[in-house]
Amino acid sequence: MVVAHPTATATTTPTATVTATVVMTTATMDLRDWLFLCYGLIAFLTEVIDSTTCPSVCRCDNGFIYCNDRGLTSIPADIPDDATTLYLQNNQINNAGIPQDLKTKVNVQVIYLYENDLDEFPINLPRSLRELHLQDNNVRTIARDSLARIPLLEKLHLDDNSVSTVSIEEDAFADSKQLKLLFLSRNHLSSIPSGLPHTLEELRLDDNRISTIPLHAFKGLNSLRRLVLDGNLLANQRIADDTFSRLQNLTELSLVRNSLAAPPLNLPSAHLQKLYLQDNAISHIPYNTLAKMRELERLDLSNNNLTTLPRGLFDDLGNLAQLLLRNNPWFCGCNLMWLRDWVKARAAVVNVRGLMCQGPEKVRGMAIKDITSEMDECFETGPQGGVANAAAKTTASNHASATTPQGSLFTLKAKRPGLRLPDSNIDYPMATGDGAKTLAIHVKALTADSIRITWKATLPASSFRLSWLRLGHSPAVGSITETLVQGDKTEYLLTALEPKSTYIICMVTMETSNAYVADETPVCAKAETADSYGPTTTLNQEQNAGPMASLPLAGIIGGAVALVFLFLVLGAICWYVHQAGELLTRERAYNRGSRKKDDYMESGTKKDNSILEIRGPGLQMLPINPYRAKEEYVVHTIFPSNGSSLCKATHTIGYGTTRGYRDGGIPDIDYSYT
């Protein structure tokens, strides 16, 4: 048994060794796995913590980072990676305050940077950006490179900046393939920006300086649905004829606060739903302006100069729900009888506001829908008259209504029915026909550069079209100038004319209050301005006005010089008198006598409270208290005993019961104290 034991030991030792090795290997592999898992978990947690870290000056909420109204001069550098919307408005951030690592935030889609200190379009923006607000900054330029860095941009707000037409780089929007909304309100634009993206659906250019719109201004904008041009300098003559007709998908057009005399020609009719024309100078509307606008729901013509509307203007407006006509001088005559009937018939579906009569006098202040008996007089029967004649005149007027010239800036043609370009060799008689009987004009040259025009209309009119042309130089092509004159005016003064020149002046009635003018032939007259050196010039009139006007210029200058010299002499005399008086005063001060200064001091002390002022070698006493002293003071010196001191007490003048006491308790016998 002793021999077998070692054998057993030798046999079992290799097995134990193998088992221990396997156990150690397994333990080692498990430890490595655990270490790897722990490292990965730590890295993941670190990434999560970094992505959710919020800047200390901001507030974060599920991807929305609120850093607005903090007075920041730069964007915080530790913006979380999961941020989707950055609110950075109402700060003082400039272009240098936009960090470069902002473009690495690939989840950011909306940035609000309005009301900051940006003077250039920011470039360090994430490519994922879809909406950018830059209102109320000082951005001056729009470069193609800046927009190319954010190709996914859909909405760009640049209101209230300093962008001008020349500061927009050519093809600046060439890489903005997804831009749908562009706001450029309240900038310095003088024309429509070129190269706008074809994907644009909403364009706002209100409150700029746009005065002209050429034919190609909106070329290719087939997706445009909303166009706002309020508060510009637009007039009919500076808008090309087919400017808006190409915008077939337009649903809203706003031309508020411009200088339109009539609605623009060829408005888009297929899908237009809202048309805003208020706050212009519109005095007439052609009968076919709103033709085929079957989708129109809202029409605003408030704050214009309309007195009447042509029959059938609203015939195609089957979906019209709101019609605003406030603040117009409506003349509720027979020509508006059709409108009264239309308002009553559509009262259930159309909300009409502001159709208040301003004339005739008997219906002033009444709503047109409430007028019955006055308009029923238009139906008086008679042979070939009554309703038939009134209807015939009204119908004829619809087709003969004047159209404000539009597009003449680009076509260089004057569209004036019945008015040819004047020729200096042709005489211009007064117009004939029914239209000529309603208007008579008289012209008179006042000065070398002005002509006065007066006229008389037999029927009240909403407006007159006045045109004039200088003759004698180029009969075939003349520079015709025209303007619209309100119907209540009876005279007009032409100024800034050429001296000794012949002018042909024509006037036509746009619309009368009771019936339209069937014949639009203008009434014309000639006038010749005076010679610039003739007796009718303003200068000669002023010279002949009175005797003072004939004084030579040298006499006027001499009189002015004499007047100035007189003032100088008087000033010298006043100065001399002043100096002499001061010397006399000083002499008297020297010769006052030999009284001593102590006398002045003593008398001043005894009589009243005074101050001493030293002037020259003597003393002068100036009283400052006009009241008499209430009691005289006698000064006594009190010698206190050894070891005692004087106590101080307040003394009031006029109260004799107040006494002072020494430390020994013995009262003083005097009423004054030291």
Swiss-Prot record:
Domain Fibronectin type-III: 437-532
One biological process term in Gene Ontology: positive regulation of synapse assembly
Tissue: Expressed in kidney and brain.
CDD domains, sorted: FN3
Ranges of residues in domain LRRNT: 49-81
Keyword annotations from UniProtKB, A to Z: Cell adhesion, Cell junction, Cell membrane, Cell projection, Cytoplasm, Cytoplasmic vesicle, Developmental protein, Disulfide bond, Endoplasmic reticulum, Glycoprotein, Leucine-rich repeat, Membrane, Phosphoprotein, Repeat, Secreted, Signal, Transmembrane, Transmembrane helix
Transmembrane parts of this sequence: 553-573
Domain LRRCT, chain residue ranges per copy: 328-380
Domain of life of the native organism: Eukaryota
GO cellular component: cell-cell junction; cytoplasmic vesicle; cytoplasmic vesicle membrane; endoplasmic reticulum membrane; extracellular matrix; extracellular space; focal adhesion; neuron projection terminus
Mapped LRR repeat ranges: 82-103, 107-127, 128-149, 152-173, 178-199, 200-220, 223-246, 249-269, 271-292, 295-316
Bilayer disposition of the protein: Single-pass membrane protein
Gene3D superfamilies: Immunoglobulins (2.60.40.10), Ribonuclease Inhibitor (3.80.10.10)
InterPro entries associated with the record: Cys-rich_flank_reg_C (IPR000483), FN3_dom (IPR003961), FN3_sf (IPR036116), Ig-like_fold (IPR013783), Leu-rich_rpt (IPR001611), Leu-rich_rpt_typical-subtyp (IPR003591), LRR_dom_sf (IPR032675), LRRNT (IPR000372)
Cytoplasmic side: 574-674
Cysteines engaged in disulfide bonds, as pairs: 54-60, 58-67, 332-357
Cleaved signal peptide residues: 1-48
GO terms assigned for molecular function: fibroblast growth factor receptor binding; protein-macromolecule adaptor activity
Residues bearing attached sugar chains per UniProt: 249, 305
One of the Pfam families matching this protein, by short name: LRRNT
Protein's job: Plays a role in fibroblast growth factor-mediated signaling cascades that lead to the activation of MAP kinases. Promotes neurite outgrowth via FGFR1-mediated activation of downstream MAP kinases. Promotes an increase both in neurite number and in neurite length. May play a role in cell-cell adhesion and cell guidance via its interaction with ADGRL1/LPHN1 and ADGRL3.
Self-association state and partner proteins as the record states: Interacts with FGFR1. Interacts (via extracellular domain) with ADGRL1/LPHN1 and ADGRL3 (via olfactomedin-like domain).
Protein's UniProt name: Leucine-rich repeat transmembrane protein FLRT1
Gene coding for it: FLRT1
